[in-house]
């Protein structure tokens, strides 16, 4: 006996319920309302360049992305996006936004990217980004910000990239980035920064790239970057930096690239680069350096690329340390490194000038072997301590560890070059003469049997030639002489003279035969 269970609803009712469930699931994907003039792709709405003066109200509340780029929006009111809790990215760049009210982005807990660049924002309340706890990318570049509230970025612990380029910032508040523990990229370039606070970058333990180029920085103390324990690249080009110092002993082992191009650097602390043992790229083109101390160069052990062009290099004995280092450098340098002074070397490559004008008599490929003092007939320089130098009879105080760049005048090297060439040529001639004499003497002393054999061979050859000539001459005479036959006896030729020999003669018509 079988049991039969009958479903209380018929087949048509089941089909209707299934269709309704499918429609309900598709409602978010279909989008309830796409704003006019916008292009909608699933839950991503693109309303760029449509002339909007405010955020459209008809936007789907479940959208994941909203782009309002290149419009005419002038202000962001409080709770402007409160109902857009599902947004993951929001692009508001290239508008005319000048005012951002407190809590304008309230409710955007899932937002990961916020682009506000190329607007007219001059002030941001300290609670502007408080609720954006998942924000990873924030772009505030190309605005008119002149200052930042110390708590502006508080709570942004997942922020990875922050763009503040091309504003009017004059200072960086202490501990501004204290809560940005995940930040890896920070761009503060093209502002009006004049100095850096000691704790201005505190908290950035994961920062790898820092841009400070095109500011108004005049002095750099690398101790201010002490907290940047993961920094890989530092850009400081095109500021007004004249001095590089390091206020404390520490090791910045992560830094690999340092760009100081286009500054006014004249002096460098002797220990600056000792704190950067793994520095691979150092660019210092277009500064005001005229020499570099050998201690500075010897600390650049890991470099693969260096840029030193466009400086005021003085091609005198003071450039010997740099020339020696360049001669042994295994990497590459950007552009040519040319002499700036004196006039007769201007425009010459440093290495060509050093060898062509013989500026360095004891040029060594090992920088550490270079002398640390220079003496010439007119001015004497002797380092007596880290805080003073003697110039002649005067003592000049300097900052401890700073390479001195005092201007001095050196005699023209033309006469010395001519004298040296004459002496060198004379010594070469004398050496050649004595060398030849030495070779001859050694040959006579060490190889007499060989000479005797050569002499004997020569004499034997001469005897053979003489004998051959004699035989030829006798043969010619016998053909024309009065004797046609001669038969000597066995006693020898003297018997003929004594009458014991026989001579058979045949008288010729024109001569007589005599016995």
Curated annotation (Swiss-Prot):
Residues 443-515 are cytoplasmic. SMART domains: LRR_TYP. It comes from the Eukaryota. Residues 34-421 are extracellular. SUPFAM superfamilies: L domain-like (SSF52058). Gene3D superfamilies: Ribonuclease Inhibitor. GO terms for molecular function: neurexin family protein binding. GO terms for cellular component: excitatory synapse; extracellular space; GABA-ergic synapse; glutamatergic synapse; hippocampal mossy fiber to CA3 synapse; postsynaptic density membrane; postsynaptic specialization membrane; Schaffer collateral - CA1 synapse. It is found in: Cell membrane; Postsynaptic cell membrane. Changing residue 181 to A: Reduced heparan sulfate binding and reduced induction of presynaptic differentiation. The keyword Membrane applies. One of its GO terms (biological process) is negative regulation of receptor internalization. Keywords: Cell membrane, Glycoprotein, Leucine-rich repeat, Membrane, Postsynaptic cell membrane, Repeat, Signal, Synapse, Transmembrane, Transmembrane helix. The chain crosses the membrane at residues 422-442. Synaptogenic effects are mediated by the extracellular LRR region. Interacts with DLG4. Interacts with neurexin NRXN1; interaction is mediated by heparan sulfate glycan modification on neurexin. Belongs to the LRRTM family. Involved in the development and maintenance of excitatory synapses in the nervous system. Regulates surface expression of AMPA receptors and instructs the development of functional glutamate release sites. Acts as a ligand for the presynaptic receptors NRXN1-A and NRXN1-B. This is Leucine-rich repeat transmembrane neuronal protein 2. It comes from Rattus norvegicus (Rat). The lineage of its organism: Eukaryota, Metazoa, Chordata, Craniata, Vertebrata.
């Amino acid at each position: 006996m079988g049991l039969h269970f009958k479903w209380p609803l018929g087949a048509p009712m089941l089909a209707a319920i299934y269709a309704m469930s499918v429609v309900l699931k598709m409602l978010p994907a279909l989008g309830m309302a796409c704003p006019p003039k916008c292009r909608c792709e699933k839950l991503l709405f693109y309303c760029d360049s449509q002339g909007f003066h405010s955020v459209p109200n008809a936007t789907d509340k479940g959208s994941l992305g909203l782009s309002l780029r290149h419009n005419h929006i002038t202000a962001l009111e409080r709770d402007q996006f409160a109902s857009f809790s599902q947004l993951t990215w929001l692009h508001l760049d290239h508008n005319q936004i000048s005012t951002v009210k407190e809590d304008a982005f309230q409710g955007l807990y899932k937002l990961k990217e916020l682009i506000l660049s190329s607007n007219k924002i001059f002030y941001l309340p300290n609670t502007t980004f408080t609720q954006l706890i998942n924000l990873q990318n924030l772009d505030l570049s190309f605005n008119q910000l002149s200052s930042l509230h110390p708590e502006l970025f508080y709570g942004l612990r997942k922020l990875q990239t922050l763009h503040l380029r091309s504003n009017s910032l004059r200072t960086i508040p202490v501990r501004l980035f204290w809560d940005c523990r995940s930040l890896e990229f920070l761009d503060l370039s093209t502002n009006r920064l004049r100095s850096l606070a000691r704790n201005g970058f505190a908290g950035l333990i994961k920062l790898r790239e820092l841009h400070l180029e095109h500011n108004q920085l005049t002095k750099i103390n690398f101790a201010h970057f002490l907290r940047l324990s993961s920094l890989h690249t530092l850009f400081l080009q095109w500021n007004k930096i004249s001095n590089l110092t390091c206020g404390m002993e520490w090791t910045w082992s992560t830094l690999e690239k340092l760009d100081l191009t286009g500054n006014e650097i004249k002096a460098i602390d002797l220990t600056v680069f000792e704190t950067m043992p793994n520095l691979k790229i150092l660019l210092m083109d277009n500064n005001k350096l005229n020499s570099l101390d050998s201690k500075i160069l010897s600390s650049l052990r890991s470099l693969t690329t260096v840029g030193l062009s466009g400086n005021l290099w003085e091609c005198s004995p003071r450039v010997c340390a740099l020339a020696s280092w360049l001669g042994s450098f295994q990497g590459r340098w950007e552009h040519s490194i040319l002499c700036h002074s004196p006039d007769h070397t201007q425009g010459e490559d440093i290495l060509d000038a050093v060898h062509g004008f013989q500026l360095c008599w004891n040029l060594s490929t090992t920088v550490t072997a270079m002398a640390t003092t220079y003496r010439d007939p007119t001015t004497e320089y002797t380092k007596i301590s880290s805080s003073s130098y003697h110039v002649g009879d005067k003592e000049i105080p300097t900052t401890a560890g700073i390479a001195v760049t005092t201007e001095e005048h050196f005699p023209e090297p033309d006469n010395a070059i001519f004298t040296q060439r004459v002496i060198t040529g004379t010594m070469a001639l004398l050496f050649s003469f004595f060398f030849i004499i030495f070779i001859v003497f050694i040959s006579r002393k060490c190889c007499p049997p060989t000479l005797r054999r050569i002499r004997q061979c020569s004499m034997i050859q001469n005897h053979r030639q003489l004998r051959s000539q004699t035989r030829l001459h006798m043969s010619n005479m016998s053909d024309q002489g009065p004797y046609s036959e001669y038969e000597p006896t066995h006693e020898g030729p003297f018997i003929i003279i004594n009458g014991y020999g026989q001579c058979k003669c045949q008288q010729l018509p024109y001569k007589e035969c005599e016995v």
